[in-house]
């Protein structure tokens, strides 16, 4: 916990309060953690969800660590699953999302793109500190 607290930037007491609150929740109800190949494991987990559930697969700053081929495979995998796909990745990380941006990725240094089901909705700060919606409605 002390290490995590050290990662909160000075002068941000609200973030420190949120971190401590989140840690308290996590300690009370620890998350299930699964390991394995991203593409295979995500498919298994989505398939295991109750049929009546709306499954949301969310990732942030994950796909940049995969090869381009693995990213393309992930997109094919996720689009074939009965789920909503919410991503928060660097502007050029998901090629099909980058192709839909209102300005080239090179014009948005340090920004991430929030996308729902592969449709970009807005630019976000890399640590979630800002969110600027595009003109179209973020909800569909």
Where are these regions (language model features)?
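Short, glycine-/Ser/Thr-/acidic-enriched flexible segments
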Residues: 38-40, 62-64, 92
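A cross-taxonomic marker for long C-terminal extensions/tails that follow the last structured domain
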Residues: 101-140
């Amino acid at each position: 916990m002390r290490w995590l607290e050290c990662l909160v930037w000075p002068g941000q007491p609200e973030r420190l309060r949120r971190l401590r609150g989140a840690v308290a929740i996590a300690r009370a109800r620890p998350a299930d953690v699964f390991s394995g190949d991203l593409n295979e494991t995500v498919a298994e987990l989505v398939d295991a969800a109750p049929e009546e559930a709306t499954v949301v697969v969310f990732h942030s700053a994950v796909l940049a660590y995969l090869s381009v081929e693995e990213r393309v495979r992930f997109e094919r995998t996720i689009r074939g699953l009965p789920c909503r796909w919410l991503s928060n990745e660097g502007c050029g990380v998901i090629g099909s999302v980058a192709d839909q941006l209102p300005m080239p990725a090179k014009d948005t240094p340090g920004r991430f793109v929030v996308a729902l089901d592969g449709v970009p909705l807005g630019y976000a700060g890399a640590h979630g500190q800002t969110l600027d919606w595009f003109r179209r409605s973020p909800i569909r």
